[in-house]
């Protein structure tokens, strides 16, 4: 190999090295915050554990794995409005990529704590009437979710 060819190979390798290192780094870890308004504040409670397990398994089925590309921060308000407000502020301070909340009691404190982080709610009877969304077709803010439809 000629000296010039050798130098080209070395310089080319040196220039491409940062790209190779970047490619070897793992995926960005996404952070999901979960705020449950009801239930036991003991996260080892069987019902709470069953709900969390179902959520984690569904995410794993979609390719998300805790410790690899996902971190879940879970808090339970225990039906205490002041505790829920503090937990909402605490979770928003962690800068999650998205916040999931179960129960109408926790939606308002989350929407007061952030105007940019997406908030996904479940078990809310009337999100438009409660002011969480402008309409069912277009929420118009950082909140979206699923309504509870009871039987009459």
Where would I find each of the regions flagged by the language model?
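Short hydrophobic alpha-helices and adjacent helix-cap/hinge residues
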Residues: 1-152
């Amino acid at each position: 190999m000629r000296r010039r060819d050798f130098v080209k190979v070395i310089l080319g390798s040196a220039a491409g090295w940062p790209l190779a290192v970047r490619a070897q780094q793992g995926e960005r870890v996404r952070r999901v915050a979960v705020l449950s308004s009801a239930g036991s504040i003991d996260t080892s409670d069987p019902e709470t554990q069953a709900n969390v397990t179902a959520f984690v398994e569904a995410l794993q089925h979609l390719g998300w794995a805790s410790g690899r590309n996902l971190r879940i921060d879970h808090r339970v308000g225990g039906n205490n409005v002041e505790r829920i407000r503090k937990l909402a502020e605490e979770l928003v301070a962690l800068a999650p990529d998205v916040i999931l909340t179960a129960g109408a009691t926790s939606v308002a404190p989350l929407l007061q704590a952030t105007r940019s982080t997406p908030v996904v709610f479940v078990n809310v009877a009337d999100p438009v009437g409660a002011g969480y969304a402008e309409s069912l077709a277009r929420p118009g803010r950082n909140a979206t979710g699923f309504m509870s439809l009871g039987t009459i």
